[in-house]
Amino acid sequence: MLSRAGAAVLLRSLGGRPEGRFSLRLDMPAGGGAAASTAARVALARAAGVTDPKTIVLACLGSEGAGDPLMLDDPGGLLWASRPGRVLARPPARPRMEIVGGFFGPMRRTDPRDAAFPDIADHSDAWPAACGDLAGVAALASESARRTIRLRGPADDPTETLAAAKGALGFVIAHTGAARGLIFAPGTVPETMPAALRASGFRHILRFRIGGGR
């Protein structure tokens, strides 16, 4: 997640001194694609008294070559480019949805040299209109996930099959890491969903709601 030496380098890049004692505890696995490494760096920066988002973005990029927008207000409401660390767009509020998922396959830590990602520029253009309804969001997220799985694997990824079998509107995956989730309208998740995920090899099962639109 963040070594002692890495923490010292991060603190220096923030204009601070590498001293003091910091304790970080995760409730997400490192390398899972759930922003644990960025969360650790943002937490360390704020504990050291640094709150300026641009300063923290630059420090995260210098530390691991990428970063999630956790240092910004409403990070879930942004289209974000993680390698250059910049906001691409602020689309309309997403509709309410319920996500059930976990982690499938090996964990994969951020590698700044890894550029094997599909082109989803067309999805960026389509995202504002898709936010008008949950089916549109789910369809766009599912196609983005398919492209990533086709390019990066694993070939036996069960997420789409599970989504179809359990009546999900779509599915989503981390472009790096092992995080995957199924998209449901709120209150429609089958009671058997967590057990089905575990039976398919998912770990650290999670369930949460997001979105604030209609």
Protein language model features and the residues they cover:
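ATP-binding N-lobe of GHMP and related small-molecule kinases
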Residues: M1-G32, S200, L206-R214
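Conserved active-site and cofactor/substrate-binding residues in soluble primary-metabolism enzymes
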Residues: L2-A5, A35-A39, G132, T188
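Long, contiguous secondary-structure blocks with strong helical propensity
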Residues: F22-R25, A39-G49, T161-G167
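Short beta-strands and strand-loop turn motifs
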Residues: R25, A141, I173-T176
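DPxDG-like acidic metal-binding loop motif
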Residues: G32-T55, C60
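ATP-dependent small-molecule kinase catalytic core of the GHMP/sugar-kinase superfamily
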Residues: K54-F171, I183-R214
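N-terminal pre-core extensions flanking Radical SAM catalytic domains
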Residues: T176-I183
